[in-house]
UniProtKB/Swiss-Prot annotation:
HAMAP family: Pep_deformylase. This is Peptide deformylase. The gene is def. Belongs to the polypeptide deformylase family. GO terms for molecular function: metal ion binding; peptide deformylase activity. GO terms for biological process: co-translational protein modification; translation. Keywords: Hydrolase, Iron, Metal-binding, Protein biosynthesis.
Length: 203
C-alpha cells in the first residue's frame, strides 16, 4: 500500500510514525506538481495534513498521540512527493486577551510558488526546527524577509498572498520541502550565527 493510500484512509490520523526523517531520499527530491481537478486522495491528504497540525497544537491531543508541535507540514515529509503544503500559525496575543481569530495563517496550498521577494533577508532568532529532523541544528536560517506566494486551493482557485515576519518564514520552510531543501542547508556552515548587513533577526 502506498503512503498516500494508507494516510488517506478514513480512520487514519497522521502521527509521528507517518513522518519520514532526514536521510530519506524523498526529502531531497523535487516534488511533482498536482493537476486539476484534484483527485479525492489529494484533497483528503491536504485536509489530513491540516488536521495533524491542529492536533499537534492541541496539548491534550498532542500528548495522547505523542506529537511534536508543528506550524507547517509538506507532503514529501509523509513520503508523498507532491507539491502540497499545509500551514497553521496560531495568533499570539497578550496574556488575558482573546484573539479575534484563532489562527494568523491557515491554508492548504497546492502548487505553492514564490513569485517575488524582498531584497532584505530575515532569520528567526531562535533558529528553526523540523518534524523530519530529530536533532537540534543551531544557527540562523537565512530567508527572504517578505514574499509573495501564488497557490491553488482544493477547488483549483488561484490565490496570491503577501507574507512577512514569522508567516513568511513558515511558508518558505514548507516550500523548501517540495523543492528538496532542508532548513539547515540555509545555515552558514563556517559561522552559523553570522549576521550579514541588513539581516533582520525575528525574535
Amino acid at each position: 500500500m502506498s503512503a498516500i493510500e494508507r494516510i488517506t484512509k478514513a480512520a487514519h490520523l497522521i502521527d509521528m510514525n507517518d513522518i519520514i526523517r532526514e536521510g530519506n531520499p524523498t526529502l531531497r527530491a523535487i516534488a511533482e506538481e498536482v493537476t486539476f481537478p484534484l483527485s479525492d486522495q489529494e484533497i483528503i491528504l491536504g485536509e489530513k495534513m491540516m488536521q495533524f497540525l491542529k492536533h499537534s497544537q492541541d496539548p491534550v491531543m498532542a500528548e495522547k498521540m505523542g506529537l511534536r508541535g508543528g506550524v507547517g507540514l509538506a507532503a514529501p515529509q509523509l513520503d508523498i512527493s507532491k507539491r502540497i503544503i499545509a500551514v497553521l500559525v496560531p495568533n499570539i496575543v497578550e496574556e488575558g486577551e482573546t484573539p479575534q481569530e484563532a489562527y494568523d495563517l491557515e491554508a492548504i496550498m497546492y502548487n505553492p510558488k514564490i513569485v517575488s521577494h524582498s531584497v532584505q533577508d530575515a532569520a528567526l532568532g531562535e533558529g528553526e526546527g523540523c518534524l523530519s529532523v530529530d536533532r537540534n541544528v543551531p544557527g540562523y536560517v537565512v530567508r527572504h524577509a517578505r514574499v509573495t506566494v501564488d497557490y491553488f486551493d482544493k477547488d483549483g482557485e488561484k490565490h496570491r498572498i503577501k507574507l512577512k515576519g514569522y508567516n513568511s518564514i513558515v511558508v518558505q520552510h514548507e516550500i523548501d520541502h517540495i523543492n528538496g531543501i532542508m532548513f539547515y542547508d540555509r545555515i552558514n556552515e563556517k559561522d552559523p550565527f553570522a549576521v550579514k548587513d541588513g539581516l533582520l533577526i525575528l525574535e
